[in-house]
Amino acid sequence: MDQRHHPQQPLLLVSTAGDPAVKVDIINGLSGYEFSRLRLIASVGSTVVWTNRTAVTQVVQLNDRVIRLAPGGNDGATALTRFSESGQILGRLRSNRAASITFFITEEFKL
């Protein structure tokens, strides 16, 4: 088919899976317990799936929210949170105060 007569349309990606989900694991790192990621960009309405991959209970502090995760492999080792407004959120591990994760929350999801 001759492409000169059919201009290309921009590709539009549409998700039918619902809200975008972001996965963050707590792992045994080089400097102790840490997050599997340091920085994330997500949109308002995104869900974060937190999973504790360590053998001990972990507590995540997100601004004014606290998430308690049971040791990996046990009930309660995974938790879900959702971003309801835009901005920057800093998360810290109580078991390693040097471990942090920063979320940049935007109004819309960008690929």
Task: Name each model feature, range by range.
Residues 2-6:
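Intrinsic-disorder-associated, low-complexity terminal segments enriched in Asp/Asn/His/Tyr and depleted
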Residues 7-18, 71-111:
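Extracellular/periplasmic metallocenter environments
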Residues 46, 56-58:
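Short beta-strand/loop motifs in extracellular/secreted proteins, especially
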Residues 51-54:
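Asparagine-centered strand-capping/turn motif at beta-strand->loop junctions
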Residues 17-47:
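N-terminal edge beta-strand
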Residues 34-36, 63, 77:
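Short, solvent-exposed loop/turn positions at domain surfaces
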Residues 59-65:
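Short, surface-exposed beta-strand/strand-loop-strand elements in extracellular ectodomains
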